[in-house]
């Protein structure tokens, strides 16, 4: 119960307008550091002037660091500054103990052994290490990888890199709801399949894959199963044993921890082998050489500890906000489509397409709300999302998609404001759309034969 009260208090603290309370009422120096002047008349951002700081609804790209995580990191920075790999003096031992405590915290969150946790720089490195590392180690007998068309770019690019080396890759399509066809997966497995890599929660559409069923299929065929769980840990219950995963990638900054640190779960029994990407001092059981980033690792552990305590409360809070956002938009707008399954979905992700609206114009018009049109790694591209195309979404609807990311510190007031601004901008753009006028008049625009010029 105490953690619920703390989380709610921090939510109010981080979103309360500047000037309405004094610094002495902050919970910590970390909370005080987040103080922002929301009363600024306007802010110039990349040549665009907006009225004050935008609302932050891009939690799949990254989350704000939890002040309690920051406090843990700050204390560690002051007191545990030794090299965790220095085994000859107290300062090294203190730093090593801090790292091992964090390793335990991460392991508990996913029901693993601390000896199965390898700290890395983030999920991208973990994905590269898993996909390339396994296939390189077993290259003499295993030449085939299975993944899906909706994976994160770093997994897809790792697979393409393997193809250039002579490996074969099967890119499974997904159903219109974003879920994997289990029979298609079963049929794709070959005697020389060395790895199946399927993400647990999709970063763009929030779809949660049937992990236990996928893991069971892989186990039946004795094929290692890797999952990118960057969007899953701390948000949905994760159990590596129930999922039958051999490798799992994780990231701290998706769960209110620091950027620059993540982990790869590497199963010990039955043992999975992989070739390291980097060579050096042999840290992290020889799988990831280099001096560990003690304070980031401490922050990762603290974030995992908080996630264990607050996941259920967070899920209920965020679910209510998701429903508030979706209902609020649909009450005032027609032609709003949810991309991806609503039955098997992480509640903090709401990917919506707005018919008869040009996507880039909608994003630019929503400059007072920090949202995205897809993955932060590819959102600079003007091409429609490859994830939505894989779902069979029409190109025009894929172009109009907006991903709303809701999190632990999001408030009802922010959701209401986001609804207001979104509805206002969509209505404005539709007023300028001749296609929308034709639809309102009952014309089926898909059957129109447009003249060639």
UniProtKB/Swiss-Prot annotation:
Pyridoxal 5'-phosphate binds at residues 123-124, 203, 231, 251-253, 291. Its cofactor is pyridoxal 5'-phosphate. The modification N6-(pyridoxal phosphate)lysine is found at residue 254. It is found in: Mitochondrion. It catalyses: (sulfur carrier)-H + L-cysteine = (sulfur carrier)-SH + L-alanine. One of its GO terms (molecular function) is ATP binding. Its EC number is 2.8.1.7. Residues 1-34 form a transit peptide. InterPro entries: Aminotrans_V_dom (IPR000192), Cys_deSase_IscS (IPR010240), Cysteine_dSase (IPR016454), PyrdxlP-dep_Trfase (IPR015424), PyrdxlP-dep_Trfase_major (IPR015421), PyrdxlP-dep_Trfase_small (IPR015422). The keyword Zinc-finger does not apply. Optimum pH is 8.5. [2Fe-2S] cluster binds at residue 377. The active site is at residue 377. Interacts with FH. Interacts with SUFE1. Belongs to the class-V pyridoxal-phosphate-dependent aminotransferase family. NifS/IscS subfamily. This is Cysteine desulfurase, mitochondrial.
